[in-house]
Every structure is written in structure tokens, then in C-alpha cells.
Amino acid sequence: AGLNDAQRRAVDHHVGPLLVVAGAGSGKTRALTHRIAHLIGEHGADPAQILAVTFTNKAAREMKERLEFLLAQRLAQSQYGQPWSTLPPVEQRQLRSRIYREVTKELWIGTFHALFARMLRYDIDKFKDAEGLTWTKQFSIYDEADAQSLVKEIVTQELQLDPKRFEPKKTRWAISNAKNQGWLPDQLEANAEGQRGKLTADVYRRYRKALAANNALDFDDLLLLPVQLLQQNEQVRSYWH
């Protein structure tokens, strides 16, 4: 399958954890993709029990496409007894469509943000927010431009602060930094220094309420809320283990 000896050992490893240490461009993604295909094709692994995390959405798409092709090649040989390249285009499309329905669609391949968003689509209704806020499974996701626009609206319209002295962009960064530390507004306020820090915590509190009112999450929430949900709910933790 075009793998070197080290890649083949990684692909064939079956029981227990395996750590692969290799530099950029050495074929780690290739080995991982072949390993997933090997686990499904040779060991009958359940696709829904396989998790692969990438840094970018592009890498996730490419991994899924490669995997579909590898599994379609296997299926062509087992079902038709002939190489993939000799199949008519219509049968190739049918095989890839079948692989997508039965395998690719069930796999958990994506970035941390994408995978956690998928998790929240299942279980966000079980999340108990410390400030009593709620979201439904149909939540929308605000990109950075949406988030900055909302913070600016709170700073300039709700609190009527001078945006030149209390910059919305810096405030948004401070809120993002707080979320990445796992802090809610009360924790940010407790660690704040001076009036500016107190105001930032106030903006953060209003920002969260505005997000919830719009049934929206920002990118930081996609990491923070799942962690909090898993910490607080044993049933959810057991399900996703």
C-alpha cells in the first residue's frame, strides 16, 4: 500500500496505545488513515468508535476522502473480485456512496472545535450553566467577526463607553483569554485589577447573556462548554468515554 516499514508497524498495531513521534512531512497522516482503514476492514471496528483529531478542517476533509478511497478499494476487491481502477465509473460512485453512508458519516474525524460542536449537538440540553443560561441543540456558532461585533455593541451601546479608551477588540481578547482559562465572569472579576478589569468582567457577563439570548456560541465556548459538561454530568461522561 506504499507504506514504509515504520508506517506499516503503526498500521498493524492493534492492542493498546501507540505513540508515533515523527517530523513534518514524514507520513503520519498517511499512516493514521491506513490504520483506520485497517481497523475497519480487517478487525471490524465500529466507525462510530473511532476518533481522529486534526488541526484544520482541510486536513479532516482530506483524511475522510483518503479513507473513503482506501475502503472503496478494499470493497471493490472483495465484492467484485477486481481492482478499483478497472471498475466502471458508475460502480465506483456507488461504492464510494456506500462507504460514506456506512463508514465515513459515522467516524469522528475533525478539529477539536468541530468534534466538540458535534458533541454539543447531542448533549447541550444537559449542560447546567453557573449563571442559569441555556442553549438548544440548534445553536448557531459565531465567528470572530460576529463575536467582536457583539462585544462592540455592548461596550458602545449598552454601557456607552468610549471605544477609544475601552477598546472592544482588546475586551474581546480578554474575554477569550478568560474562557481559555476556564473562567466565568465572576472568576474574571475576582482576578481583575482596577476599574477596567471590573468593566471587562461586566462586558463578559453581558456578552454571555447576549449569546444565550441568540442561542449562539463562540469558538471558545466550543471548547469550554464540553469540558464543563463532562465535569458536571457523570452520565454524559460515561457515554462519551
Regions found by a protein language model. Give the residues of each.
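N-terminal alpha-helical segment
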Residues: 3, 32, 203, 219-222, ...
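Hydrophobic residues in alpha-helical segments
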Residues: 40, 211-212, 230-231
